[in-house]
Amino acid sequence: LKKLFTDRLALMSDSAQVHGDVVRIAIGPKTMYLVNHPDLAKHVLADNAANYHKGIGLQEARRALGDGLLTSDGETWKKQRRTIQPVFQPKRIARQASVVANEVEGLVKRLRDTTGPVEILHEMTGLTLGVLGKTLLDADLAGFTSLGHSFEAVQDQAMFEAVTLSMVPQWAPLKKQLRFRESRDDLRRIAEELVEQRFANPAENGEDVLSRLIDSSGTREQMRDELITLLLAGHETTASTLGWAFHLLDEHPDIAEKLRAEADAVLGDQLPTHEDLHRLPYTARVIEEVMRLYPPVWLLPRVAQADDEIGGYHIPAGSDVVVVPYTLHRHPAFWPEPEKFDPDRFDPDRFDPDRPSGRPRYAYIPFGAGPRFCIGNSLGVMEAVFVLTMVLRDFELRKLPGYDVVPEAMLSLRVRGGLPMTVHTRNRR
């Protein structure tokens, strides 16, 4: 029980290793089932998805996020998804490539002018929020400096609720609950301000999320909730993935050099375009491997609506069922040397004699799976590719000597306490 509060990742990993693909954990009067096998994950997330609604943690996050796309279920979720789906159409995302590249170029210029260590997670949070604002909202978020801190408090509280299975009353005078309420109010204020700005200044083409929300004729509260959800989900996962990427590439300079060589050969001194994505396969494999080891969505909590059976276990209605991508992505039956950072395991030309037909589809689900597959995955991957190629072709980023990088399991998987790194300009020949 102590590990639920002190080291959730170790609890998940140890439980999977000792108890197998379904782990039953009793917490007071409540029971949680951890799911750690691709076939069982497919059952929960796709085949029988209608029986599994959003679960612990995300239910509690609703207190801050409202009924946005991340927390809603049923017909409400379907309507919300239909409303904003056009914003994420492949052709529209492709048209945003120049916007993303220009935002990353601004980051490169800031890094070039830096003296001393840079807190890289802070930089990635600012960058991803900036990209989100320009590409999806047609808005400038630079003035809303409290966004990152407020979202961190919301994640902290949601995860606290998850590991206690919501048994701590909301009125309990805990410092984290006070911080949560202050952050919730801050997020609502920012979202309401952005909505009012769009009402006052309609966008010319009306293709952005704010315009779509206004056209949907929802209430101001519904628009606010959708916007808060988008702001969180749209920046946090990409920022966390990039933080882990810079950490792992610092640990594996040979892989960083291969990525640089590809960037030099494909891009030269030019900004990347959407058409360049298929010409940067090694960079894409690096990002895939980063997300295998540190999936941005590291657990997928659900609540069973009716009795079910998973892996031989009877699952009573009302049970908390958690699919755990963090352990799925390290399952030794599907991932040889699962702790090794090896981007080439995603090379389509690499043949594995133990798995001639390839690994199961649900052995790798960094963006979730089934009907609730992450709507913004293509934008996030494009952004990550652009950041790694543009930053690494100009710089080497190195962690401070002796700095201990520890995962922190929030709604996403973050580096605890940030990631300070020194920036060294690369001698490009």
Task: Please give the residue ranges for each predicted region.
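N-terminal membrane-proximal hinge/A-helix region immediately C-terminal to the signal-anchor transmembrane segment
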Residues: 1-79, 94-106, 127, 139-142, ...
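Conserved cytochrome P450 K-helix E-x-x-R motif and the immediately C-terminal K′/meander segment
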Residues: 2-20, 189, 193, 269-311, ...
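Cytochrome P450 heme-thiolate monooxygenase catalytic core
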Residues: 9, 53-60, 76-78, 92-240, ...
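Conserved cytochrome P450 K-helix/beta-meander segment immediately N-terminal to the heme-binding cysteine loop
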Residues: 50, 323-358
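Short, small-residue alpha-helix embedded
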Residues: 237-250, 387
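Cytochrome P450 heme-binding "Cys pocket" and the immediately downstream C-terminal segment
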Residues: 253-255, 379-413
